[in-house]
Regions:
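Hydrophobic, aromatic-enriched alpha-helical segments typical of multi-pass transmembrane helices
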Residues: 1-178
Length: 178
């Protein structure tokens, strides 16, 4: 049990990415099929939050010296903010769009700064996902209304690029890293 909690960054980030991809696929399929997960959705949200934090915290070591130290330290800060915003929104209907607007900029930055670390297709997916996050969460934050509807096909594109850019890209980069 101790080994699970005290593992190296690479292994922890890989496990977080697998969980992130799995939870997002479950949500994506459930959304398309209009499934109601009930209270299990709270469990999925918890796993999603922890997996996303694991991915974000691992980016510091994955990117290494390709980004400045203040950027690397910023990953811990955004991971904490995303975790708090995500978990606060589990049982309460809170407006967390401000935090996720900022997170959209972080995803965009990940795509732009990870050249040579994450393969281009996954970097571009992160850039697209970041732009979607900025537009969707930003419009909700500024106007109170998201310009991308919840049941819009364009939201599926944003979600798939989010899974690819934030989940698959770093996972494959970690798999290649010695």
């Amino acid at each position: 049990m101790k080994k699970f909690f005290i593992q190296d960054v690479k292994e922890g980030s890989q496990q977080a990415a697998y969980m992130f991809i799995a939870v997002n696929v479950v949500w994506l399929v459930g959304g398309i099929a209009e499934l109601d997960y009930g209270n299990f959705d709270n469990v999925l949200q918890l796993f999603w939050s922890f997996s996303l934090v694991g991915i974000i915290l691992g980016l510091k070591d994955l990117q290494g010296d390709t980004v400045p130290e203040d950027w690397r330290q910023g990953y811990a800060m955004i991971a904490a903010a995303v975790l708090v915003a995500s978990l606060l929104g589990v049982n309460e209907d809170l407006n967390t769009s401000g935090v996720f607007t900022f997170f959209g900029f972080v995803i965009l930055g990940l795509g732009v700064t990870s050249e040579g670390v994450i393969d281009n297709i996954w970097r571009y997916a992160a850039i697209i996902a970041g732009l979607f996050g900025i537009v969707a969460a930003g419009s909700q934050f500024i106007t109170g209304t998201s310009i991308i509807a919840d049941d819009s096909p364009i939201q599926i594109v944003g979600w798939v690029t989010f899974i690819a850019g934030v989940g698959i890209g770093p996972l494959l980069a970690w798999n290649k890293k010695e």
